[in-house]
Curated annotation (Swiss-Prot):
This is Serine/threonine-protein kinase 1. The keyword Transferase applies. It holds the Pfam family Pkinase. GO terms for molecular function: ATP binding; protein serine kinase activity; protein serine/threonine kinase activity. Gene3D superfamilies: Transferase(Phosphotransferase) domain 1. It comes from the Viruses. Belongs to the protein kinase superfamily. Ser/Thr protein kinase family. It comes from Autographa californica nuclear polyhedrosis virus (AcMNPV). SMART domains: S_TKc. InterPro entries: Kinase-like_dom_sf, Prot_kinase_dom, Ser/Thr_kinase_AS. Serine/threonine protein kinase that plays a role in viral propagation by phosphorylating various viral and cellular substrates including the viral p6.9 protein or host histone H1. Participates in nucleocapsid assembly and polyhedra formation. Residues 21-271 form the Protein kinase domain. It catalyses: L-seryl-[protein] + ATP = O-phospho-L-seryl-[protein] + ADP + H(+); L-threonyl-[protein] + ATP = O-phospho-L-threonyl-[protein] + ADP + H(+).
Length: 272
């Protein structure tokens, strides 16, 4: 009881010393969570507060925050509290753009920069996978790049799931692996396939490997059909041979021919 009271008192004091602020980078509410930025007046430190309806709350989100809280490429959690209606998570606010916004600012990124970003992302995901968790929503918007620190941050753990648990069509369709489309159980291949798609987007200014035009919106049937006929020639918009091969190796249709093992992925020439 004493510990509970002390925690409650700390939480009350924290909120008494905070105010809502706006930041220079765009903050977008997710489908299941409302985002606000808090400034702690005594320290001027910024925190990100995520409020999730109890109906949409995934307890694994908290578990991943706690497991990876001290990891340099994940977001540190400070408070987690809730009611019958909502769950609230207070975490570090990272003052940098996500990769979607980075592409909007810079356009197509250089081979060297993309290689650096993807290497850090692969290392971070491998550390998450060691805990038998799949991120399950790797995309441009869920990866931050702090250029001044040369550091990648993996964020938004709301769809994280245990390996071998049941899968559903959650997340962002254009990053779905063939296995996720077929509803196989959760597997690290879900994340590695998404890394392949994300890499292609960074190298081409936001294009998808299987789109026929820049403004095409891919649906589930188009994805299923085009994944089956993926060929290295399809990836023609990536000019660098090593980068093109990396994307191809991570997005091949047949999982037995695809790179899904971290030790093999990290040794690819694109990341060396």
């Amino acid at each position: 009881m004493a510990t509970t009271n002390a925690t409650l008192q700390t939480l009350v004091q924290f909120y008494e010393n905070c105010k809502n602020v706006k930041t220079r980078y765009k903050i977008i509410n997710g489908r299941f969570g409302k985002i606000s930025i808090l400034s702690h007046k005594p320290t001027s430190k910024l925190y990100l507060q995520k409020t999730i309806s109890a109906h949409n709350f995934n307890a694994d989100e908290i578990k991943v925050h706690q497991l990876m809280s001290d990891h340099p490429n994940f977001i540190k959690i400070y408070f987690n509290h809730g009611s019958i209606n909502n769950q609230v998570i207070v975490m570090d606010y990272i003052d940098c753009p996500d990769l979607f916004e980075t592409l909007q600012i810079k356009g197509e990124l250089s081979y060297q920069l993309v290689s650096n970003i993807i290497r850090q992302l692969c290392e971070a995901l491998n550390d998450l996978h060691k805990h038998n968790f799949i991120h399950n929503d790797i995309k441009l918007e869920n990866v931050l790049y702090f250029e001044a620190l040369d550091r990648v941050y993996v964020c938004d753990y709301g769809l994280c799931k245990h390996e071998n648990s049941l899968s559903v069509h959650d997340g962002t369709l254009e990053y779905f692996s063939p296995e996720k489309i077929r509803h196989t159980t959760m597997h690290v291949s879900f994340d590695w396939y998404a890394v392949g798609v994300l890499t292609y987007k960074l190298l081409t200014g936001g294009r998808h490997p299987f789109e026929k035009s820049e403004d095409e919106m891919l649906d589930l049937n188009s994805m299923k059909r085009r994944q089956q006929y993926n060929d290295i020639g399809v990836l023609k918009h990536v000019r660098n041979v090593n980068a093109r091969d990396f994307v191809y190796c991570l997005t091949r249709y047949n999982i037995d021919c695809r790179l899904t093992n971290y030790k093999q992925i990290i040794k690819h020439e694109f990341l060396s």
